[in-house]
Regions:
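Residues within the helices of the helix-turn-helix
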Residues: 24, 35, 67, 78
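The alpha-helix within a helix-turn-helix
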Residues: 27, 38-39, 70
Length: 84
């Protein structure tokens, strides 16, 4: 088993950014406006979603978000992890 100490902050940030880029790309490919997706997810803030999607202010999607987005956009959840 690998030690968690090998996962530095930069690698973790790249992980989150890759997921964010994939979420945004897939959402746009599906022609789904941010507001519609946010409402269908049951979120109360498009600002929060936008920050997650653009990796701003240390905001990122959690597993529940990724799961809901995959269902709403009708994509396999693994699509969000491509490039990692």
């Amino acid at each position: 088993m690998k030690s968690l100490s090998i996962v530095d902050e930069e690698k973790l940030q790249q992980f989150y950014e890759t997921i964010s880029i994939n979420v945004k790309r897939i959402r746009q490919e599906k022609n789904k406006p941010q507001l519609d997706l946010v409402l269908e997810m049951g979120l109360k803030s498009t600002s929060f979603f936008s920050k997650c999607e653009n990796s701003k202010d240390n905001h990122h999607f959690n597993l529940e978000h990724i799961y809901k987005i995959a269902i709403i956009l009708d994509v396999d959840i693994s699509e969000f992890f491509k490039g990692i």
